[in-house]
């Protein structure tokens, strides 16, 4: 999957929120947001799939520790529409990441890497980032 934006040295601390707004492609199959220490150490791989890898209208989350993927977690809540502008807010603490979807629904994903700061963000797939904000 082609990578769009890559940012490093973010220094996002526990309790702070990363707000990502972007446009989902009209013919979207999937997109992703990766957060962590670097490309091989991700506390969150956030992958909404419209129709990809055998999943339809499902959010797949995972982590990557020293290049090794963990166990996938699937969310059936799927407020994304092709051709729409969406906003996702992600915050974290020592135990969990909290992902707030465009419709206000929130779910948690374990902070398996126990990161104390998030320094890396990448985005890819059928998603064009319009705005990244820290709160």
Swiss-Prot record:
Q: Which GO terms describe its biological process?
A: apoptotic process
What does the entry list under GO cellular component? cytoplasm; extracellular space
The record gives the effect of mutating residue 69 to L as: No carbohydrate binding
Question: Where does the record place it?
Answer: Secreted, Extracellular space, Extracellular matrix; Cytoplasm; Secreted
Recorded GO molecular functions are:
lactose binding; laminin binding
Keyword Glycosyltransferase applies: no
Which residue intervals define the domain Galectin in the entry?
Answer: 4-135
Write down the InterPro entries for this protein, in alphabetical order.
Answer: ConA-like_dom_sf (IPR013320), Galectin-like (IPR044156), Galectin_CRD (IPR001079)
Binding of a beta-D-galactoside, residues: 45-49, 53, 62, 69-72
The disulfide bridges present are none
SUPFAM superfamilies this protein is in?
Concanavalin A-like lectins/glucanases
PTM sites of type N6-succinyllysine: 108
Q: Which domain of life is it from?
A: Eukaryota
Keyword annotations of the record:
Acetylation, Apoptosis, Cytoplasm, Extracellular matrix, Lectin, Phosphoprotein, Secreted
- Residues that bear N6-acetyllysine: 13, 29, 108, 128
Residues recorded as bearing Phosphoserine in the entry: 30
What this protein is reported to do is described as: Lectin that binds beta-galactoside and a wide array of complex carbohydrates. Plays a role in regulating apoptosis, cell proliferation and cell differentiation. Inhibits CD45 protein phosphatase activity and therefore the dephosphorylation of Lyn kinase. Strong inducer of T-cell apoptosis.
Recorded protein name is: Galectin-1
Taxonomic classification: Eukaryota, Metazoa, Chordata, Craniata, Vertebrata
User: Which gene does this sequence derive from?
Assistant: LGALS1
């Amino acid at each position: 999957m082609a990578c769009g934006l890559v940012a490093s040295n973010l220094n996002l601390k526990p309790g702070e929120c990363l707000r990502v707004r972007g446009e989902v492609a009209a013919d979207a199959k999937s997109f992703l947001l990766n957060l962590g220490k670097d490309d091989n150490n991700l506390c969150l791989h956030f992958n909404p799939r419209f129709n990809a890898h055998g999943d339809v209208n499902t959010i797949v989350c995972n982590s990557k520790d020293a290049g090794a993927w963990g166990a996938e977690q699937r969310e059936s809540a799927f407020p994304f529409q092709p051709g729409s502008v969406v906003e996702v807010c992600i915050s974290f603490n020592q135990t969990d990441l909290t992902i707030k979807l465009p419709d206000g629904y929130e779910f948690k994903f374990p902070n398996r890497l126990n990161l104390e700061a998030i320094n890396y963000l990448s985005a890819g797939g059928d998603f064009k980032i319009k705005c990244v904000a820290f709160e």
